[in-house]
C-alpha cells in the first residue's frame, strides 16, 4: 500500500477491531476481572503478565513494558510495517482510502458477498449442468441433502465460465484467487471440471474454495484457494461452521485431513468433524477448537506421514492442556481413510474406533520412549532429556504435573526431583522499565489517556486557554482530540501520535500506574488542571510585571495582566 492513510479511517478501523478477539487469535487469553491476561508473546515468561483491556482497546505487559493498540500488536507480533498492519486489520468491506486522491472512494462489491454469490453460482451449476459431478458424488454414497448442507458445487469445463458469469468483478475475483492472470496477461478460471467445496469461516462467510478433480488425469487432485485477505489456510478449519451451527459446544470434535472425510462422516450421521486445509494442525487451530470443546480426537492415517502429522498436532496441543483440554489419537489401517472406513464399517464401527483412541499422554510417552531401554540409567536419562523440552513449553498446571508423574513411573525417579530437573532455569528476564518520574503534567496526561470519559465532566470546570501553549502541548492536543471526538478511546488517542517524537512517552503514560483511585479520577484530573492553570498564570504575571519594568506593556498586554490578577484574586477567595 502506498500513500497516506487518513486518520479518520485509522480511527474507524481501530473502533471496528476487537483487540481481545484479535490477540486471542494468536495468544490464548483468560478473562480476569475487567481485563484478559496471558503469558507475554514478546518475552519468555511462565507467569502471565500480559494484560489486555477491552474497554481501552489497549494491551500492556507488566514484565517487559510492551504496550499499544491493535496496530501496534500486529506490527510487533507479525513483524509488519504500519501500512501492512493496517491492511492486515482492515475488514474486507472497508475500503482503504488515500489522502490527496481527489476522488470519492466508492465501495466495490463486498468480497464476502461476492464469494457467497460465486458459491451459489457453483451450486446452480451442480444442479443444472453437473451430471458428471452428481454421478461421482452418488458413487461415493453422498446424498443431495449432504451436498446441500455443505453447499457443494461444480466448476464446469472451460477456461472462462466464472469470468463471464461475473464480468464486472474481474479485479475482485483475481484478488480472491478465483481467477488467475498468466505471465502473458491472460485471465482464466482457477477451477475447471472440479467438485467445489466452499470454505466458510466460523461466522459462516465463504472465504475460499477447495476443488476436487473429476478427471483422474488432472492434477492436483485437490486444489485450495491461495492465501488472500479473506483466507489464510493455517487459521481455518473446513466444516467448523457446520459443527458450531448445530451445536455451539460439542462434547468432542474430530479432526481429519480432507474435505471428503468430513462429508463422508456427516453422511453417516457423524457431524462433529472438521478438517485442516492442507497444513499441519497449528497452535491457532487448537486455540480455535479449545474455545468450543474440551475433547479433541485426531484421526490420521497409520503410516509414517500420519504419525508425523499426529505428533505435530500433539505439539500444538501441549500449551492448552492445563486449561482442561484433552486429546486422543486414532491411527487408521493403511488401506483406509475415514471416508473408506465409515463406508465399510458403518457409523457404529467408526464410533467404536473412537472409543479406542490413544490418549495424548500415552501417545506422547510411547513415541518418545520408542527404542529406549528404560531398565538402565542411560535409557532413563535419554527419556528425561527427550521429554524435557516439551514440558518446558507448558505453563505450570495440573496436566503438566500429571505428565511429570507419568515420567516418574517410567523412570522410577521421584516427581519432585524430576520437576527440579525439568524446570527451565533460563527464563528470560525482561528489561527493567525505567520508572516515569511523577509530575502534575504527566499525571494529567496519563489520566486523560487511560480514562478519556472524564473529559466531558472536567471540561466544564477547566479552561484550556489558560494552559501554556508550549509547556502543555501534549495535554492541549489531547483535549482537542477529545473535543473533536468525545467517544475516543485509549487506542485511538495514542494512534494520533504514532509519527510524533512523543509517541513512546504517550504509550508509556497510557500504561503508567498513576496511583489515583478510580473513584477520584475526575476530581484528581480537575485539580491537576487547575494547578497547571494556576502555575501558568503565575508565570505569565511575572513575565508581564518584569516587562512592564523594563520596556512597558502594550494596551493588550496591560488588559491581559489585569485579567490574570483578577483570576488570581478570585481563585484565592475560593480557596479561603
From Swiss-Prot:
GO cellular component: cytoplasm; DNA-directed RNA polymerase complex; primosome complex
InterPro entries reported for this sequence: DNA_helicase_N/primase_C (IPR016136), DNA_primase_core_N_sf (IPR037068), DNA_primase_DnaB-bd (IPR019475), DNA_primase_DnaG (IPR006295), DNA_primase_DnaG_DnaB-bd_dom (IPR013173), DNA_primase_Znf_CHC2 (IPR036977), DnaG_bac (IPR030846), DNAG_N (IPR013264)
Catalytic activity: ssDNA + n NTP = ssDNA/pppN(pN)n-1 hybrid + (n-1) diphosphate
Annotated coiled-coil segments of the chain: none
Annotated ranges, domain Toprim: 251-333
SUPFAM superfamilies to which the protein is assigned, alphabetical: DNA primase core (SSF56731), DNA primase DnaG, C-terminal domain (SSF117023), Zinc beta-ribbon (SSF57783)
UniProt binding sites for Mg(2+) 2: 301, 303
Entry note: cofactor: Binds 1 zinc ion per monomer. Binds two Mg(2+) per subunit.
Domain of life: Bacteria
GO BP term, example: DNA replication, synthesis of primer
Cofactor names: Zn(2+); Mg(2+)
Keywords for this protein: DNA replication, DNA-binding, DNA-directed RNA polymerase, Magnesium, Metal-binding, Nucleotidyltransferase, Primosome, Transcription, Transferase, Zinc, Zinc-finger
Binding site for Mg(2+) 1: 257, 301
MF-aspect GO terms: DNA binding; DNA-directed RNA polymerase activity; zinc ion binding
Entry EC number(s): 2.7.7.101
Pfam families in the record: DnaB_bind (PF10410), DnaG_DnaB_bind (PF08278), DNAG_N (PF08275), Toprim_2 (PF13155), Zn_ribbon_DnaG (PF01807)
Annotated zinc fingers (CHC2-type), start-end: 40-64
PROSITE patterns recorded: TOPRIM (PS50880)
Binding partners and assembly: Monomer. Interacts with DnaB.
NCBIfam families found in the cross-reference section: dnaG
UniProt comment concerning the protein's domains: Contains an N-terminal zinc-binding domain, a central core domain that contains the primase activity, and a C-terminal DnaB-binding domain.
PANTHER family for this protein: DNA PRIMASE
Known role: RNA polymerase that catalyzes the synthesis of short RNA molecules used as primers for DNA polymerase during DNA replication.
Family statement: Belongs to the DnaG primase family.
Entry protein name: DNA primase
Amino acid at each position: 500500500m502506498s500513500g497516506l492513510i487518513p486518520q479518520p479511517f485509522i480511527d474507524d478501523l481501530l473502533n471496528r477491531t476487537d483487540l481481545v478477539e484479535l490477540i486471542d487469535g494468536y495468544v490464548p487469553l483468560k478473562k480476569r476481572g475487567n481485563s484478559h491476561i496471558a503469558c507475554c508473546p514478546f518475552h519468555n515468561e511462565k507467569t502471565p503478565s500480559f494484560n489486555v483491556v477491552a474497554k481501552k482497546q489497549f494491551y500492556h505487559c507488566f514484565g517487559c513494558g510492551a504496550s499499544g493498540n491493535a496496530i501496534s500488536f500486529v506490527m510487533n507480533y507479525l513483524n509488519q510495517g504500519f501500512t501492512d498492519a493496517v491492511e492486515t486489520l482492515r475488514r474486507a468491506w472497508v475500503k482503504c482510502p488515500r489522502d490527496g486522491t481527489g476522488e470519492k472512494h466508492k465501495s466495490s462489491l463486498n468480497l464476502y458477498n461476492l464469494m457467497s454469490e460465486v458459491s451459489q453460482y457453483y451450486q446452480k451449476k451442480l444442479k443444472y449442468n453437473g451430471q458428471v459431478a452428481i454421478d461421482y458424488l452418488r458413487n461415493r454414497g453422498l446424498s443431495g441433502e449432504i451436498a446441500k448442507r455443505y453447499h457443494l458445487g461444480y466448476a464446469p469445463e472451460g477456461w472462462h465460465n466464472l469470468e463471464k458469469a461475473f464480468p464486472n468483478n474481474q479485479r475482485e475475483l483475481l484478488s480472491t484467487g478465483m481467477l488467475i492472470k498468466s505471465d502473458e496477461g491472460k485471465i482464466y478460471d482457477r477451477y475447471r471440471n472440479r467438485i467445489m467445496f466452499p470454505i466458510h469461516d466460523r461466522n459462516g462467510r465463504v472465504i475460499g474454495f477447495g476443488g476436487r478433480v473429476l478427471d483422474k488425469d488432472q492434477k492436483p487432485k485437490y486444489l485450495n484457494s491461495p492465501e488472500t485477505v479473506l483466507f489464510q489456510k493455517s487459521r481455518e478449519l473446513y466444516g467448523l461452521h457446520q459443527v458450531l451451527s448445530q451445536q455451539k459446544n460439542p462434547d468432542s470434535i474430530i479432526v481429519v485431513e480432507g474435505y471428503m472425510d468430513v462429508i463422508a462422516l456427516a453422511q453417516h450421521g457423524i457431524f462433529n468433524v472438521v478438517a485442516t486445509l492442507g497444513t499441519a494442525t497449528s497452535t491457532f487451530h487448537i486455540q480455535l477448537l479449545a474455545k468450543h470443546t474440551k475433547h479433541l480426537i485426531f484421526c490420521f492415517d497409520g503410516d509414517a506421514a500420519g504419525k508425523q502429522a499426529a505428533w505435530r498436532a500433539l505439539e500444538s496441543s501441549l500449551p492448552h492442556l492445563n486449561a482442561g483440554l484433552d486429546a486422543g489419537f486414532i491411527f487408521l489401517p493403511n488401506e483406509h481413510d475415514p471416508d473408506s472406513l465409515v463406508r465399510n464399517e458403518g457409523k457404529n464401527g467408526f464410533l467404536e474406533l473412537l472409543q479406542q483412541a490413544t490418549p495424548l499422554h500415552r501417545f506422547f510417552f510411547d513415541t518418545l520412549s520408542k527404542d529406549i531401554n528404560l531398565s538402565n540409567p542411560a535409557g532413563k536419562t535419554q527419556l528425561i532429556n527427550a521429554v524435557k523440552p516439551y514440558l518446558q513449553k507448558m505453563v505450570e498446571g495440573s496436566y503438566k504435573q500429571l505428565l511429570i508423574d507419568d515420567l516418574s513411573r517410567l523412570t522410577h525417579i521421584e516427581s519432585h526431583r524430576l520437576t527440579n530437573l525439568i524446570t527451565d532455569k533460563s527464563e528470560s528476564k525482561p528489561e527493567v522499565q525505567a520508572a516515569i518520574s511523577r509530575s502534575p503534567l504527566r499525571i494529567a496526561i496519563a489520566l486523560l489517556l487511560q480514562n478519556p470519559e472524564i473529559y466531558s465532566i472536567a471540561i466544564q470546570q477547566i479552561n484550556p486557554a489558560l494552559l501554556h501553549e508550549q509547556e502543555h502541548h501534549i495535554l492541549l492536543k489531547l483535549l482537542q482530540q477529545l473535543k473533536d471526538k468525545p467517544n475516543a478511546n485509549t487506542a485511538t488517542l495514542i494512534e494520533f501520535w504514532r509519527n510524533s517524537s512523543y509517541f513512546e512517552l504517550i504509550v508509556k503514560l497510557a500504561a503508567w500506574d498513576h496511583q489515583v483511585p478510580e473513584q477520584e479520577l475526575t476530581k484528581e484530573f480537575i485539580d491537576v488542571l487547575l494547578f497547571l492553570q494556576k502555575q501558568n498564570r503565575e508565570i505569565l504575571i511575572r513575565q508581564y510585571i518584569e516587562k512592564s519594568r523594563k520596556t512597558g506593556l502594550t494596551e493588550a498586554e496591560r488588559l491581559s495582566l489585569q485579567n490574570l490578577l483578577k483570576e488570581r484574586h478570585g481563585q484565592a477567595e475560593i480557596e479561603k
